[in-house]
């Protein structure tokens, strides 16, 4: 994780239509290059439309599941409710590796429906989540905007249903 020139991406977040700030992430392309590239390209939208016919882009998608003390999940830009999404490689792609662990707040990891079912859905941790190690690929970490992440957590619930509409209003890659 000490490699130089790791890609950085951002999410601009709105809560109920009100701009609420930006989260910036570094992507661990040195450890999980395929997974990091999927997320980076979904932030930029550079791959055009996917199999679903929808843009391969996180812009204007929502965080559909937020559980305080656990994580915020988003990335379903096809259905919007956790049942959809797709990767830049097709609907899904295989688990790359589980080298990086779910140790800490602000880690980006792939949400999935079992082994080798990575698409576009991801989650951001609020705490250590070691029970996810070996099942979900960690591929990035927040480097700026932790107060925005705290705001997401405040809008979560035990059921996971957010108490507000949390939208990614813009996203992309930051060049140094």
Swiss-Prot record:
Gene3D superfamilies: Cyclophilin-like. PROSITE patterns: CSA_PPIASE_1, CSA_PPIASE_2. One of its GO terms (cellular component) is mitochondrion. GO terms for biological process: protein folding. One of its GO terms (molecular function) is cyclosporin A binding. It comes from the Eukaryota. It is an enzyme of class 5 (isomerase). Keywords: Isomerase, Rotamase. PPIases accelerate the folding of proteins. It catalyzes the cis-trans isomerization of proline imidic peptide bonds in oligopeptides. This is Peptidyl-prolyl cis-trans isomerase cyp6. It comes from Rhizopus delemar (strain RA 99-880 / ATCC MYA-4621 / FGSC 9543 / NRRL 43880).
């Amino acid at each position: 994780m000490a490699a130089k020139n790791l890609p950085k991406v951002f999410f601009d977040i709105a809560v109920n239509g009100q701009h609420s700030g930006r989260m910036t992430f570094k992507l661990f392309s040195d450890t999980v290059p395929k997974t990091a590239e999927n997320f980076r390209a979904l932030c930029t939208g550079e791959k055009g439309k996917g199999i679903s016919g929808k843009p391969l882009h996180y812009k204007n998608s929502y965080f559909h599941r937020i559980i305080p003390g656990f994580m915020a999940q988003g990335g379903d830009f096809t259905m919007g409710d956790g049942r959809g999404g797709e990767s830049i490689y097709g609907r899904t792609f295989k688990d790359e590796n589980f080298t990086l662990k779910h140790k800490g707040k602000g880690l980006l990891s792939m949400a999935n429906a079992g082994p080798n079912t990575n698409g576009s859905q991801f989650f951001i941790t609020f705490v250590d989540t070691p029970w996810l190690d070996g099942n979900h690929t960690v591929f990035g970490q927040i480097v700026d905007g932790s107060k925005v992440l705290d705001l997401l957590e405040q809008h979560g619930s035990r059921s996971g249903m957010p108490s507000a509409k949390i939208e990614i209003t813009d996203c992309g890659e930051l060049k140094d």
